[in-house]
C-alpha cells in the first residue's frame, strides 16, 4: 500500500536547508494496510475510472484515507442543509465552519503544511519518463508499483476520442497525444495493449497528421529520444547566452520559467544529443508517422503544428528568423571555426544549469527544467555527482491520487496553500479552538522563509535577491516570488497579533523587514509587480515565443494578483511597523494602487492569470483597493467590480466560471450554469470586503446558502472543476482551494455580515 511521507530525507544524495520541512513524497510499502484499507483504495480508484469522462478531476482521496487512519477525528457535527426560503443564521454558519475546520485540521501534516495534488498538466510526466529511459535509470528510480500507477493515470486521462489533452480537462492535442502515447510505450505497454486504448491513441495521432504536427516542445522531446530528427526542429542556439545583456532578446531578460526551460533545451540542441536507439524507439518511428520515417520531410516539419494545439501561432517574423538560423547560421556553427563558438556556448549553458540545480537543492524551478537539467547532467557525464543528486528529487514531483500517479507542476504548493489557510482560519474568529492547527502552520511559515540570497554575483546569474522572500513551495526550492512573499508576510503578521501562548513565538521583526525589502524591490516603474523578478524586457518579445501552446511566456509581466497581494501585505505591515522605510512603503502602495486601477477592464473585472479567472482576478483587484480604504460607496472602481460580480451570480446563489475564460479572455460560465465552491468563495470575499453588506445583503445570503449546502457529510467540500491556470492556456490543480476558500468566505460572512447585522 502507498504511504505519503512528510519532511523526510532518506537518501545521502539529498541536500536541504531546513531539515526537509515541507517535503512530501509517496512510497510503496507492500506490508501496509488492512484488507479494509486496501478495499477502500480500490473502491476510490474504481469510482474515478467509472466516472472519468464526467468528473475528470480526482478528489485526493488516497491522502484523505491515509490521514483519516492516522489522525484522531473528533465526532462530526450534524450536517446543515438550508432551504431556499430559510434564513441563514449565525448558528448554521458557525456549525458549518466548525465542521469544515474539524475536517481540514485532520489533513494537516505534522510539519504544519497541507499536502495536496498540484497536478493537471499532461505534458510533464512524459519528459520524466523519456529522460529516465534515455539515462537507463527508469527501473532504478521507479518501482513496478510506480509504473503501474503512472499507466493508470495515463489511461484514466485519455479522452473519449482516443487522444490526450494539454491538461486533464482539455480537448485532445497532438502534443498531449503523442507524448502520452510514447510514455505508455516506454512504461512497457505494447502498441495494442490497454483493451484497444493504445490503438485508439495511435489512430487519433495518425488521423490528425501524425507526429510531424507536434508542437516545438514535443519535437524536442521526440528528438532526444530518437523518434524525430533534430533537422525537424527550429533552432534553439545556445549562443544566445553569449549575447550582451543590453540586448532586449538576451535570455537573462526573459521570464525565469521561460529561460530556465530554453537553457537546457539549447544545450541539448547545441549538442544534437540523441539517446540510445532501442527497439521501442525504432517501433515508435513506425507508429507515429503517416509516411515511412525515412521519407519524412524534416525541413517542412519544422513549422508544422496541428490546429488543435495552436494557441499562439508563429508570426511571419518568427518563421523568417528560424529559417535564417536553420539554413545560414547553424551550418556555420556546426563546423570549424564556428564550432569553437558553439563549444563556448555549450559550456556557458551547462554552467548555468549547474547553478540552478545547486541553488534549488536539485529540485529546480519547475518540472520541465528539472528533467531537462537532469538529462543535461547525464549527457555531460553519466557518472556525475550532479546526475546522482538529481535522482532522489524526482519523487518530490510525483503525486498519487485515486486517478493514478502524476507529475506535479512544482514540488508542491506548500507555502502558498498554508499562507491562505492561516488567513482563512483567522477570518473565522475561532482561533482558540483551532490554536494547535495555527501553531503548526505558524511553525511551517517560519521554517519556509528563504534566509539567504543565492551565492556569487547575482547579475552574472540573472537572479533577483531572495533573502527574506517566501517561496511557492518549500525553502529548499528557494525561488523568491512576489505574491508568495506577500501572502507569507500577511500570515506572519496576522499570527504575530495572536497570543503566543496559542500560536507560538512571532517571527523576528528583522525577517519581516527583509520580506518587505523583497516586495519593494520587485515593483516595476508602472507600479505593478510581476512574479519572480522585475519585468526586464518588452512585450514585443512575444514575437519570438516559439511555444505554440502557451501565451505570454517570454517576459515576466506585472499581474493584478501579485500587485494586490503586495499592497495588502504592506498595509498590514505599516499598521504594525509604521516607522520602517515609511516613505518607500507609502510610495510603493500608492503606485501599486494606481496600477491596479489602470488595468481594470471596462466591465469592472480584472483578468486573473493564475486561477479561473475573472472571479479570481476581481477578488484580488477589489482586495487591493479595499486595503487602502476604498469601498463600493467611495470608489467607482470598486463599485464597478461589484456590479460585474453580481451580474455573474447564478440562480443557485453561487458563481461558476469555466477555464475557457482563461484562454478566450471572455467570461464563460461552467456547463449547465453550475456553481463552484471556489469561485463562489472568491466572489463573496470580494463583495464582503467591498461593503456589499451595507448596500444589499441578499446576494451574500444566497451565496452563503450555496456554500453551506455544498459541504459534504464529513465536513469536506467537493472537488469540482479545475481552478488553477498558467500561461493563459494550461490548467493546474489546487486541491486545497475547495477547503480554504469556502471556510474563509463563510468566516468573513459570519464575522462581518451576520454578527455586524446583529449588533
Curated annotation (Swiss-Prot):
Record's keyword annotation contains Magnesium: no
Active site: 483
Coiled-coil segments: none
Knockout-associated phenotype: Albino phenotype leading to lethality.
Stored PROSITE patterns: TERPENE_SYNTHASES
InterPro entries named in the record: SQ_cyclase_C, SQ_cyclase_N, Squalene_cyclase, Terpene_synthase_CS, Terpenoid_cyclase/PrenylTrfase
UniProt family annotation: Belongs to the terpene cyclase/mutase family.
This protein's name: Cycloartenol synthase
Amino acid at each position: 500500500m502507498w504511504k505519503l511521507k512528510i519532511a523526510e530525507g532518506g537518501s545521502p544524495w539529498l541536500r536541504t536547508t531546513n531539515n526537509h520541512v515541507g517535503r512530501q513524497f509517496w512510497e510503496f510499502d507492500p506490508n501496509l494496510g488492512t484488507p479494509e484499507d486496501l478495499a477502500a483504495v480500490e473502491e476510490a480508484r474504481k469510482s474515478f475510472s467509472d466516472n472519468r469522462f464526467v468528473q475528470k478531476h480526482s478528489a485526493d482521496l488516497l491522502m484523505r484515507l491515509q490521514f483519516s487512519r492516522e489522525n484522531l477525528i473528533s465526532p462530526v457535527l450534524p450536517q446543515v442543509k438550508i432551504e431556499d426560503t430559510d434564513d441563514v443564521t449565525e448558528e448554521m454558519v458557525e456549525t458549518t465552519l466548525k465542521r469544515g475546520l474539524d475536517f481540514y485540521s485532520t489533513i494537516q501534516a505534522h510539519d504544519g503544511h497541507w499536502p495536496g495534488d498540484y497536478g493537471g498538466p499532461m505534458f510533464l510526466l512524459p519528459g520524466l519518463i523519456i529522460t529516465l529511459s534515455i539515462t537507463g535509470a527508469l527501473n532504478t528510480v521507479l518501482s513496478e508499483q510506480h509504473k503501474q500507477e503512472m499507466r493508470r493515470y495515463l489511461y484514466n486521462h485519455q479522452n473519449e476520442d482516443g487522444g490526450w489533452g494539454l491538461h486533464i480537462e482539455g480537448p485532445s492535442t497532438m502534443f498531449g497525444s503523442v507524448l502520452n502515447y510514447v510514455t505508455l510505450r516506454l512504461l512497457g505497454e505494447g502498441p495494442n495493449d490497454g483493451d484497444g486504448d493504445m490503438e485508439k491513441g495511435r489512430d487519433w495521432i495518425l488521423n490528425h497528421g501524425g507526429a510531424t504536427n507536434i508542437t516545438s516542445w514535443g519535437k524536442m522531446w521526440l528528438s532526444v529520444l530518437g523518434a524525430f530528427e533534430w533537422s525537424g526542429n527550429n533552432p534553439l542556439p545556445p549562443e544566445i547566452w553569449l549575447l550582451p545583456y543590453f540586448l532586449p532578446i538576451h535570455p537573462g531578460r526573459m521570464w525565469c520559467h521561460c529561460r530556465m526551460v530554453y537553457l537546457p533545451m539549447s544545450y541539448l540542441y547545441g549538442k544534437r544529443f540523441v539517446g540510445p536507439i532501442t527497439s521501442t524507439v525504432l517501433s515508435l518511428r513506425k507508429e507515429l508517422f503517416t509516411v515511412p520515417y525515412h521519407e519524412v520531410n524534416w525541413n517542412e516539419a519544422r513549422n508544422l503544428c496541428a490546429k488543435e494545439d495552436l494557441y499562439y501561432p508563429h508570426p511571419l517574423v518568427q518563421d523568417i528568423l528560424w529559417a535564417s538560423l536553420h539554413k545560414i547560421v547553424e551550418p556555420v556553427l556546426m563546423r570549424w571555426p564556428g564550432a569553437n563558438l558553439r563549444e563556448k556556448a555549450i559550456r556557458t549553458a551547462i554552467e548555468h544549469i549547474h547553478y540552478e540545480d545547486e541553488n534549488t537543492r536539485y529540485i529546480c524551478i519547475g518540472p520541465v527544467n528539472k528533467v531537462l537539467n537532469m538529462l543535461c547532467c547525464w549527457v555531460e557525464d553519466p557518472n556525475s555527482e550532479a546526475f546522482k543528486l538529481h535522482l532522489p528529487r524526482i519523487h518530490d514531483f510525483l503525486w498519487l491520487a485515486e486517478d493514478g500517479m502524476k507529475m506535479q507542476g512544482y514540488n508542491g504548493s506548500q507555502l502558498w496553500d498554508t499562507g491562505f489557510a492561516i488567513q482563512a482560519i483567522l477570518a473565522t474568529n475561532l482561533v482558540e479552538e483551532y490554536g494547535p492547527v495555527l501553531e503548526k502552520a505558524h511553525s511551517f511559515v517560519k521554517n519556509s522563509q528563504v534566509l539567504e540570497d543565492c551565492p556569487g554575483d547575482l547579475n552574472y546569474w540573472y537572479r533577483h535577491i531572495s533573502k527574506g522572500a517566501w517561496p511557492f513551495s518549500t525553502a529548499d526550492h528557494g525561488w523568491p516570488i512576489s505574491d508568495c512573499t506577500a501572502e507569507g508576510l500577511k500570515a506572519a503578521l496576522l499570527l504575530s497579533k495572536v497570543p503566543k501562548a496559542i500560536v507560538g513565538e512571532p517571527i523576528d521583526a528583522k525577517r519581516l523587514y527583509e520580506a518587505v525589502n523583497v516586495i519593494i524591490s520587485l515593483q516595476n516603474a508602472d507600479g505593478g509587480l510581476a512574479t519572480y523578478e522585475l519585468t526586464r524586457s518588452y512585450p514585443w518579445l512575444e514575437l519570438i515565443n516559439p511555444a505554440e501552446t502557451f501565451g505570454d511566456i517570454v517576459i515576466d509581466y506585472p499581474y493584478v494578483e501579485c500587485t494586490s497581494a503586495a499592497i495588502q501585505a504592506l498595509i498590514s505591515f505599516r499598521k504594525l511597523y509604521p516607522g520602517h522605510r515609511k516613505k518607500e512603503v507609502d510610495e510603493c502602495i500608492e503606485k501599486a494602487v494606481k496600477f491596479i486601477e489602470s488595468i481594470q477592464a471596462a466591465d469592472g473585472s480584472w483578468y486573473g492569470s493564475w486561477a479561473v479567472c475573472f472571479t479570481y482576478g476581481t477578488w484580488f483587484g477589489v482586495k487591493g483597493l479595499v486595503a487602502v480604504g476604498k469601498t463600493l460607496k467611495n470608489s467607482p472602481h470598486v463599485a464597478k467590480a461589484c456590479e460585474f460580480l453580481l451580474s455573474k451570480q447564478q440562480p443557485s446563489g453561487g458563481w461558476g466560471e469555466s477555464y475557457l475564460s482563461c484562454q478566450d479572455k471572455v467570461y464563460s460560465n461552467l456547463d449547465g450554469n453550475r456553481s463552484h465552491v471556489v469561485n463562489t468563495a472568491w466572489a463573496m470575499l470580494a463583495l464582503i470586503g467591498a461593503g456589499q453588506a451595507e448596500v444589499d445583503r441578499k446576494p451574500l445570503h444566497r451565496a452563503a446558502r450555496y456554500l453551506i449546502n455544498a459541504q459534504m457529510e464529513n465536513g469536506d467540500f467537493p472537488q469540482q472543476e479545475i481552478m488553477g491556470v498558467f500561461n493563459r492556456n494550461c490548467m493546474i490543480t489546487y486541491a486545497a482551494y475547495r477547503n480554504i476558500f469556502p471556510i474563509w468566505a463563510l468566516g468573513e460572512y459570519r464575522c462581518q455580515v451576520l454578527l455586524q447585522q446583529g449588533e
